[in-house]
Every structure is written in C-alpha cells, then in structure tokens.
Amino acid sequence: MKRERATRCATIALVVTVTLGVAGCDNESGVNTGKPAVSIPALPGVSAPTTTTSSKPVAAPVDFTRLLLQARDVSTTGDAYIAQPATPNPDSRPGAEVLIVNQEQTKAVSILLVALDSPAAGPSALAEAQASLTKSVNPGPPQPSIVGTGGTVVSGNSPDGAKSVTVLLFTEGSALARVEFDGLPGRPADADFVTNVGQKQAIALRVGLPAPQGTP
C-alpha cells in the first residue's frame, strides 16, 4: 500500500510539473490569449476584429464585395457603366468599396459599405460620415432621402470645382452605405437616378446581410 501511494504521489507531482512547464513556455513565446486584438480606427459602431475565448459558435464574416451593386445595376439606356474590381475591407475596415464609371468617363458612382456592430450604431455612424463630407464636396443643405434608414443626400461641387458631387448616406441593418455620384461641373446627378441606385443598394444589403442576433 505504501508503494502504491508513493507511486500516485509521484504521478501527481509529474502532472503538476508538466502543466507549469507548458504555461511557462506560453509566457516565453509572448502568446497572451487573454488580451484582445488591437482595435482598428473606424467610424463609431464599426466592427473591429478581436480574439475571443467563448465556446459559442462564431458567425462567418460577411463578404461585402458580393453585396455591392454591379455595373448593370447602374447603367441606363444610352449610358453604360463599367465597374472596376471591388476592394474588400478598405482602410482595414470591415466592408467593401467599388468604383463604377460610364464609358464616356464623364460620370462615376462610387459605393462604400461599412459594417456596423449593430443597427443601433447607425445614427452615430451617419453623423460622423456626414461631418466628413466637406473633404469631398462643398455641400448645400442636406436633404432627406427615402432610401434605407436615416437617408440623407447632399449635393454640390468638389472643393476644387472640377466636378459635381452628390452623396447619398444611409444605413441598412448593420451596415452604413455611402454612395457618391460624380459628374461634370454644374451638372449634378439626377435626383431620381440617385434614389433608384440607392434603393437597389439598400435591397442588396437587406437581402444579403444576416439577421441580427435574437431575430427569429
């Protein structure tokens, strides 16, 4: 009995030694699974990747490039557009961006989609996006739009006067959309065209984004 007890005690001591040794190796390697990843600067409510130790299943990240409009969605009779390759996660922000230019290269539509943490983050994200518009346009008074949630349109010329600029901002679910229409100076995009393109993008987001957690 004394020999069996001594054997069990030796085994326990060995397990403790090995466990402490493994923990020591983790510390030496610099791995610290208890700290989150560094946050990425972004708009308020914009998702940023972090590490987690939760055992709950994690939803796959959304591929926003497949939710962007294509050239055929913007083209009209007698005015065909061509899309450049889409950019995933521009400026390290979850989302996507694409530039669509007409064949005469006199008009362009650029679409930026940015993921939000939740629909509740929409108002603050819209406010921040609207505040930054002066970098690309000398806007007139903002006008409400029927597109999405919080839809707002501003129109004017670029700061250098080289082109007309109309920007539509709105949110749809957990995403912010910024749709910019560029054209010749003094010839802003037609209001119906802006609304039509915006509604198509809102529908693409509504259909393609996963339902918020807790939604049946």
What do these predicted regions represent?
Residues 2-13:
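Bacterial N-terminal signal peptides that target proteins for export
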Residues 20-24:
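C-terminal motif of bacterial Sec signal peptides marking the signal peptidase cleavage site
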Residues 26-98, 191-198, 202-216:
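N-terminal "mature-domain start" segment
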Residues 75-89, 123-168, 203-216:
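Short Gly/Thr-rich strand-loop-strand
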Residues 95-102, 164-172:
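Short, surface-exposed beta-strand/loop micro-motifs that present aromatic residues
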Residues 96-126:
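A short acidic-to-branched-hydrophobic micro-motif
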Residues 110-112, 174-183:
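Short, well-ordered beta-strand elements
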